[in-house]
């Protein structure tokens, strides 16, 4: 009789044990899914942080690039060691030393002058600014580059200064115009500017190609105003 009374309890225990065994994999699966969900959320947060960091770095890089052309003659080579030297014995070019260059359709009210008297890059920019209220010329298309080249081919020099110069720091160096206009055109000689030396840009009187040159070199120059 006692065995018969104990039998239902034994059966109940066996069934409960089977239920626990069947539920165990389901619980483990739920825990695994929860862990995977946490890992996925963590991965998404890391991706967002990384993307934000890259955006910040890129934005800072663009700011550095923009500021490079906003600074005036930050490159030591382009700047005279003593700014007062620019004022020493300063004289504007004589009439016989200048030649008017045909204007550009891009700016119908602008004037352009070829100054035959050789100057360093900084001295030439100083003359353009103080004598004519302008800058060394900026060139934005092939046709105007050709006009400049045709006019300068009459001078007894291989090159003339135009308003391009290299500014910035390390990887953020870039070519800029002294008048602050956008650098949207270039006509480099083969191998230039990568194999060139110097931080200033000169136009070759034969062919009209551009070359990098040492800024303290004395050359004729073209002003725009």
Swiss-Prot record:
SUPFAM superfamilies registered for this protein in UniProt: C-type lectin-like
Pfam family, one: Lectin_C
Keywords: Disulfide bond, Lectin, Signal
Span of the signal peptide: 1-17
An individual GO BP term: negative regulation of translation
Tissue/organ expression: Expressed in bone marrow. Not detected in placenta.
Annotated compartments: Cytoplasmic granule
InterPro entries membership: C-type_lectin-like, C-type_lectin-like/link_sf, C-type_lectin/snaclec_domain, C-type_lectin_CS, CTDL_fold, EMBP_CTLD, Eosinophil_major_basic
Transmembrane parts of this sequence: none
CDD domains, per the entry: CLECT_EMBP_like
Record-level GO cellular component terms: collagen-containing extracellular matrix; extracellular region; specific granule lumen; tertiary granule lumen
Primary localization: cytoplasm
Top-level taxonomic group: Eukaryota
Gene Ontology molecular function terms on file: carbohydrate binding; extracellular matrix structural constituent conferring compression resistance
Disulphide bond pairs: 128-223, 200-215
Described function: Possesses similar cytotoxic and cytostimulatory activities to PRG2/MBP. In vitro, stimulates neutrophil superoxide production and IL8 release, and histamine and leukotriene C4 release from basophils.
Protein name per its UniProtKB record: Proteoglycan 3
Coiled-coil blocks: none
C-type lectin domain sequence ranges: 107-224
């Amino acid at each position: 009789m006692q065995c018969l009374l104990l039998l239902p309890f034994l059966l109940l225990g066996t069934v409960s044990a089977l239920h626990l065994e069947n539920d165990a994999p389901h619980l483990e699966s739920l825990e695994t899914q929860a862990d995977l969900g946490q890992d996925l959320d963590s991965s998404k947060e890391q991706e967002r942080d990384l993307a934000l960091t890259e955006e910040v770095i890129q934005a800072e890089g663009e700011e550095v690039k923009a500021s490079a052309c906003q600074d005036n003659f930050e490159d030591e080579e382009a700047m005279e060691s003593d700014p007062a030297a620019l004022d020493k014995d300063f004289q504007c070019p004589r009439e016989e030393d200048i030649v008017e260059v045909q204007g550009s359709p891009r700016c119908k009210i602008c004037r352009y002058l070829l100054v035959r008297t050789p100057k360093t890059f900084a001295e030439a920019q100083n003359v353009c600014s103080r004598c004519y209220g302008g800058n060394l010329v900026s060139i934005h298309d092939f046709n105007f580059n050709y006009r400049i080249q045709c006019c300068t081919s009459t001078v007894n020099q291989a090159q003339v200064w135009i308003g391009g110069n290299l500014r910035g720091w390390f990887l953020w160096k870039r070519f800029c115009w002294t008048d602050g206009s956008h650098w949207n055109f270039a006509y480099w000689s083969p191998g230039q500017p990568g194999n060139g030396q110097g931080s200033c840009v000169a136009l070759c009187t034969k062919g009209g190609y551009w070359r990098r040159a040492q800024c303290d070199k004395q050359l004729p120059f073209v002003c725009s105003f």
